[in-house]
Amino acid sequence: MEKSYVKFETPEDVSQKALDLVESAFRSGKIKKGTNEVIKSIERGESKLVVIAEDVNPPEVVYYLPSLCEDKKVPYVYVKKKADLGSKVGIASAASVSIVDYGKNEELYKSIVSAVEQLKK
C-alpha cells in the first residue's frame, strides 16, 4: 500500500548508502532518533539529512517530516523498513533518524543528497 508521506521512490542503492551513513554517524554519536528528536533537530537547523522508514504505522507518526524537511531545506531519503533503520542505531526499529554530523563521510553524504535531488525532479 502506498504511504501518503512517501513523496518519491528511493532506489535500493541510495537507501543502502543512507543506512551506511546512519550507522557510521551513530558510531560517532551524531544522530537523533525518534520522531520528536528528529523534528527538534530539523527545527533547530542541526539536521544534515533525515532518513524516514516507509513502513511506519500509523503513518501519522512521520507524516509531517517530508514537508518540514522541505520547508527547512533539509534533504531527506526513505528506507524500506523501520527495522533496518533501527538496527543501524542500536534499537529494534526506528521510524526516522536525523544525521546531525556525518563525520568523515562527506563524499557518501554528498552522493546521497545528489541522488535525492535527481529523484525529486
Swiss-Prot record:
Q: Does the record carry Manganese as a key word?
A: no
Keywords noted in UniProt: Cytoplasm, Ribonucleoprotein, Ribosomal protein, RNA-binding, rRNA-binding, tRNA processing
Naming one, the record's GO cellular component terms include: cytoplasm
UniProt xrefs under InterPro entries:
eL8/uL1-like, Ribosomal_eL30-like_sf, Ribosomal_eL8-like_CS, Ribosomal_eL8/eL30/eS12/Gad45, Ribosomal_eL8/Nhp2, Ribosomal_eL8_arc
Gene Ontology molecular function: ribonuclease P activity; rRNA binding; structural constituent of ribosome
**Which compartments is it annotated to reside in?**
Cytoplasm
Can you cite a GO biological process for this protein?
tRNA 5'-leader removal
* Pfam families per UniProt: Ribosomal_L7Ae (PF01248)
So what does this one do? Multifunctional RNA-binding protein that recognizes the K-turn motif in ribosomal RNA, the RNA component of RNase P, box H/ACA, box C/D and box C'/D' sRNAs.
Subunit note: Part of the 50S ribosomal subunit. Probably part of the RNase P complex.
Please report the name of this protein according to its UniProt entry: Large ribosomal subunit protein eL8
